[in-house]
A protein has these predicted regions:
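Hydrophobic residues within alpha-helical transmembrane segments
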Residues: 42-45, 73-76, 87, 107, ...
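The cytoplasmic-loop to transmembrane-helix boundary for the fourth helix
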Residues: 139-159
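Class A (rhodopsin-like) GPCR signature focused on the TM5-ICL3 interface and adjacent 7TM helical core
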Residues: 122-134, 166-176, 208-244, 338-360, ...
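Extracellular N-terminal segment of 7TM GPCRs
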Residues: 1-49
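Intrinsically disordered, low-complexity cytoplasmic regulatory segments of eukaryotic proteins
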Residues: 177-189, 229-326
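Extracellular TM2-ECL1-early TM3 structural module of rhodopsin-like
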Residues: 29-41, 66-128, 133-143
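Seventh transmembrane helix
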Residues: 337, 343-358, 377-419
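Loop architecture of class A 7-transmembrane GPCRs
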Residues: 18-25, 99-109, 161-215, 220
């Protein structure tokens, strides 16, 4: 995802192989690409086992939800980046001027652009799903079949945006003057824009389209999550406490009006309730003595106790339903927070790349005028997009209790099998 080409100097002797080429490659690796190589290696070591574990747990252990589909899609894109593009990136970095494999380069760069574009479109789908769930809870919600359609559309869009990489990228010639020896150049080959595209505007157009697309998606993501955050804060400070109390009061009120169950006293107290007329007090006492041994009286007691028990069970069920609603809402907020952090990491990891592309578009000689340290930092920043592919499992682990527990259970099972 970089273009570090140089203009062809005037050389009468060109060295295309041998010890000079290998020495120059080693020197360039040590002075410019070593930080990028170490960074990519770390991302590979974190991302490969992390994404494999995430994919297994969400595929085999998680219940089917829209969030599960989206996370599986993101993880699949990240896994391909980690398993395929990162090893290829390491190969290019360690043999930067000795990588003469045009076809491999084309597919390598194409897959990189495709996976990153796919992730951005899936994250856009996630933001829309979260927005509908939190800001428009009464509207029809996305279901698993809808989330699969979103993932399919994201895949198609990623192909549409990435296909120019198959044409533009390939083997590029890099002439390197030999210090102290005039008119002698080492001719290197690397994986960048092909030579015949360097004098055209196609690479610039490709970068501008990707940059504009990235900015549009970022604006959409920021807008969605800003509205979500506003709604969560609004409910947390004003609506949530009152609505919670109202829900409890509604349950109690409903229970109190259901045959006045909360006003029921013990059966004997209910029966001994005095009548308002004083002259009927003797008759009441007499009727009481008569009914104490009556079978109807026993049946009445059983009926009333059964009714009271049912009402109490109903009250408990409605209280539990309120708690269940609150628990589900809390879980939804936690899931949204986790997916927001994944989105934030994705956006942040692409900021250095976008900035460098903008600078490079405005000043074509920017890279050539940098010192060796500057070139090292430049190439390191260009590969910051790998952060998103490798660190997403870390976010899932730190922000999802259930995921952590599933990981513990998974490793316990492995440990038990070894024993």
């Amino acid at each position: 995802m970089a273009n570090n080409s140089t203009s062809l100097p005037m050389c009468s002797i060109n060295i295309t192989e041998g010890i000079y080429l290998e020495t120059a490659n080693t020197q360039i690796f040590k002075t410019i690409f070593m930080p990028s190589f170490v960074f990519t290696t770390i991302m590979f070591l974190i991302g490969v086992p992390g994404n494999a574990l995430v994919f297994y747990i969400y595929f085999a252990k998680w219940r089917k939800t829209t969030g599960r589909i989206f996370i599986l899609a993101l993880t699949a894109f990240d896994m391909i980046n980690c398993f395929f593009t990162m090893p290829m990136e390491l190969a290019v970095l360690s043999n930067f001027i000795m990588f003469d494999h045009g076809s491999i380069c084309k597919y390598f760069r194409y897959v990189t652009f495709m996976m990153n574009s796919g992730s951005s479109f899936v994250l856009a789908g996630i933001a829309i799903d979260r927005y509908i769930r939190i800001c428009m809870p009464l509207r029809p919600q996305l279901r698993t079949k809808h989330s699969k359609v979103v993932v399919f559309i994201a895949l198609i869009m990623s192909v549409v945006f990435a296909w120019p990489a198959l044409l533009l990228y390939g083997t590029q010639t890099i002439p390197i003057p030999v210090p102290g020896k005039q008119h002698i150049c080492i001719i290197g080959k690397t994986c960048l824009y092909e030579d015949h595209f360097l004098a055209t505007s196609y690479p610039l157009i490709f970068n501008i389209v990707l940059l504009i697309g990235n900015i549009i998606i970022d604006i959409g993501l920021i807008t969605c999550y800003s509205l979500i955050g506003y709604q969560v804060i609004k409910r947390g400070t004003a609506v949530e406490p009152t609505s919670s109390v109202k829900m409890r009061k509604a349950s109690i009120s409903t229970m109190s009006t259901d045959d006045n169950i909360l006003d029921y006293k013990r059966p004997e107290e209910w029966e001994l309730h005095p009548l308002s007329s004083p002259e009927n007090s003797v008759n009441v006492s007499a009727e009481k003595n008569e009914k104490q041994n009556s079978p109807d009286k026993t049946k009445c007691k059983v009926t009333m106790q059964s009714s009271a028990s049912k009402k109490r069970d109903t009250f408990r069920q409605r209280s539990l339903s309120v708690s269940s609603i609150e628990a589900r809402r809390t879980q939804m907020y936690k899931t949204t927070s986790m997916l927001f952090m994944v989105t934030l990491l994705f956006m942040g990891s692409f900021v250095p790349y976008c900035v460098i592309v903008m600078i490079r578009s405005l000043n074509k000689d920017y890279y050539h005028n940098l010192t060796s340290i500057g070139k090292a930092v430049y190439n390191l920043f260009l590969r910051f997009y790998m952060l998103s592919s490798s660190l997403n499992p870390v976010i899932y682990c730190f922000m999802t209790i259930q995921f952590r527990q599933q990981c513990k259970d998974f490793f316990k099972q492995i440990k038990c099998r070894r024993k």
